């Protein structure tokens, strides 16, 4: 039987691998023999003197492993003719290990020797050892050592290591500035660090706290640097309350006229109109925001049942919920506040309940001008948009309204192209997308597949490609340029199918179905994962949470984590960074 081309190719690859292994084995054997000769001082032509230790070697081996020794032995340097070469300012054990590496290509890098090895490998230009040390240190970076590693990397010209350390410093600044390493930094490094836009903080008052901590650590000697250090704090970004109660009361500030001017300037900023604020640069440029995303679920028809779901550890945390129950309401999150609006309890509810996740406080505002249930809502650029819905059992509405969180005022916007209720709505890239729903909450209300998009800049609606499956009471989430419609129900019953809208292509595509069929689906996305946390099947509720990875198109039914018990709940993603930790305890 003739051998196929594929079999021949596979055979050749196998033969090459075996030959390469044999070559490596032979080379290791040769180098092992040479290393034994070195230890026995056989044919050695150079002695490295480190302090009082004598280390024999062969020039050719050292020259092959180290560019430093290559230049030393192949040029007209004095050492090229000397049998004994003295290495000053070197550690005997470290040089011994480097020489051993030249013969064996093996070396042990650990926390006790990594700094000395990196220093020596850098000095004697032994790149493989330098890389091993850099890789080791990159894995060891944490809040307690990142500043020191950054300084070391800068001194030894290791840009890759420095980038890793600096990125860690910026991402974990709120932990780093509380360490001893930070307090012992020199003024130049502190000034540079506090000026970075990429510092990840909950709010600018944390940068202020870092600056004051550093100054007070050695106040007599750091007094001359006070203005330079505090000038890096962006006072206009600090809340008016913190400026007046904490910053102004700080003795360091009170005793320094220049620093006091900075604080007053920050307070004046809060009195400016939004237009005037935009004209200011530098001092009002925001830092990189620190986030702690959780999914908030509010009981709706059972208001006493409200919780956070933490996707990091799959934990549930209770939320204090004093608001009255509402059926078929909506909720959105913007700037630390969850807005619960619409819904009904015998009659439409006019009030909008608001929950500040940072302060753990509830209060009320005037709700939409047209009270209704089965509406959809989303937030964009400081505005909350509500669409459609029905006025307790009536037909669906075309209505589209907007609440400005800055002016606390409601405005009616151009109506949707299609009347709808029990639909989904999301913000994506500054535009508002509305998908599915039905023409009414009664049995005869036709389920819709139509979709449309609203542009706040032009205040116009545009019809989009319809969904493959008509659906209402579905989940609708935005993940990386795709809008996912999850489950829900059509005219025949509950759905397990899932489809996504490709914004760039204006088309819908089906993906893997859920391992559960839901008449109503309550889901939200954090990162690239969609979490289905509650839902109703028609005869029972969802028992355990479901996870969908949008990158792998895989569903997981997490049997260890119970789903939220209220199927009529409201759901939204919130950022709890800065919230009182006591309110987040399970």
UniProtKB/Swiss-Prot annotation:
This is Kelch-like protein 7. One of its GO terms (cellular component) is perinuclear region of cytoplasm. GO terms for molecular function: protein homodimerization activity. It is found in: Nucleus; Cytoplasm. The keyword Nucleus applies. Residues 44-111 form the BTB domain. The keyword ATP-binding does not apply. Pfam families: BACK, BTB, Kelch_KLHDC2_KLHL20_DRC7. SUPFAM superfamilies: Kelch motif, POZ domain. Residues 146-248 form the BACK domain. Pathway: Protein modification; protein ubiquitination. Substrate-specific adapter of a BCR (BTB-CUL3-RBX1) E3 ubiquitin ligase complex. The BCR(KLHL7) complex acts by mediating ubiquitination and subsequent degradation of substrate proteins. Probably mediates 'Lys-48'-linked ubiquitination. Its main location: nucleus. It comes from Mus musculus (Mouse). It comes from the Eukaryota. One of its GO terms (biological process) is protein ubiquitination. Homodimer. Component of the BCR(KLHL7) E3 ubiquitin ligase complex, at least composed of CUL3 and KLHL7 and RBX1.
């Amino acid at each position: 039987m003739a051998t196929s081309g594929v079999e021949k190719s596979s055979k050749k690859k196998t033969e090459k691998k075996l030959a390469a292994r044999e070559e490596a084995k032979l080379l290791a054997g040769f180098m092992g023999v040479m290393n034994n000769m070195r230890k026995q001082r056989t044919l050695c032509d150079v002695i490295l003197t480190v302090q009082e230790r004598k280390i024999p070697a062969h020039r050719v081996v050292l020259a092959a492993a180290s560019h430093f020794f290559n230049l030393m032995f192949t040029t007209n340097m004095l050492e090229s003719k000397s049998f004994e070469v003295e290495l000053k300012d070197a550690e005997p054990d470290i040089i011994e290990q480097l020489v051993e590496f030249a013969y064996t290509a093996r070396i042990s890098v650990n926390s006790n020797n990594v700094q000395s090895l990196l220093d020596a490998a850098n000095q004697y230009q032994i790149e493989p050892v330098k890389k091993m040390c850099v890789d080791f240190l990159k894995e060891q970076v944490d809040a307690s050592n990142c500043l020191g590693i950054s300084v070391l990397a800068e001194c030894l010209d290791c840009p890759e290591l420095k980038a890793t350390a600096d990125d860690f410093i910026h991402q974990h600044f709120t932990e780093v500035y509380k360490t001893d390493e930070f307090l012992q930094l020199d003024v130049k490094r502190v000034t540079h660090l506090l000026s970075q836009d990429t510092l990840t903080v909950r709010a600018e008052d944390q940068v202020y706290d870092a600056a004051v901590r550093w100054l007070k650590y050695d106040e007599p000697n750091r007094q001359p640097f006070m203005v330079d250090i505090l000038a890096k704090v962006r006072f206009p970004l600090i809340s008016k309350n913190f400026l007046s109660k904490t910053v102004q009361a700080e003795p360091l500030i009170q005793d320094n006229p220049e620093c006091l001017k900075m604080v007053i300037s920050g307070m004046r900023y809060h009195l400016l109109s939004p237009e005037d604020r935009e004209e200011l640069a530098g001092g009002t440029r925001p830092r990189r925001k620190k986030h702690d995303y959780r999914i908030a679920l509010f009981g709706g028809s059972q208001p006493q049942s409200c919780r956070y779901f933490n996707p990091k550890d799959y934990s549930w945390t209770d939320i204090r919920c004093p608001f009255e129950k509402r059926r078929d309401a909506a909720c959105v999150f913007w700037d630390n506040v969850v807005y619960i609006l619409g819904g009904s309890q015998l009659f439409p509810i006019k009030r909008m309940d608001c929950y500040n996740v940072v302060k753990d406080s509830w209060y009320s505002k005037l709700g939409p001008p047209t009270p209704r249930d089965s509406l959809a809502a989303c937030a964009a650029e400081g505005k909350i948009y509500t669409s459609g819905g029905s006025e307790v059992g009536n037909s669906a509405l075309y209505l589209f309204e907007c609440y400005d969180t800055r002016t606390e005022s409601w405005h009616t916007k151009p109506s949707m192209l299609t009347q709808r209720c029990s639909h989904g709505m999301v913000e994506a890239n500054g535009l508002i997308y509305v998908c599915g729903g039905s023409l009414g909450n009664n049995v005869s209300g036709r389920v819709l597949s139509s979709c449309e998009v609203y542009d706040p800049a032009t205040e116009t609606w545009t019809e989009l490609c319809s969904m493959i499956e008509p659906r209402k009471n579905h989940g609708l989430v935005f993940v990386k340029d795709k809008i996912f419609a999850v489950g829900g129900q059509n005219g025949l019953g509950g759905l397990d199918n899932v489809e996504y809208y490709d914004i760039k292509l204006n088309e819908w595509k089906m993906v893997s179905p859920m391992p559960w069929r839901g008449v109503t689906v309550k889901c939200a996305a954090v990162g690239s994962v969609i979490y289905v946390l509650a839902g109703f099947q028609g005869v029972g509720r969802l028992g355990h949470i479901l996870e969908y990875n949008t990158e792998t198109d895989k569903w997981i039914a997490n049997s260890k984590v119970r789903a939220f018990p209220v199927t009529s709940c409201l759901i939204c993603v919130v950022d709890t960074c800065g919230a009182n930790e006591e309110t987040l305890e399970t």
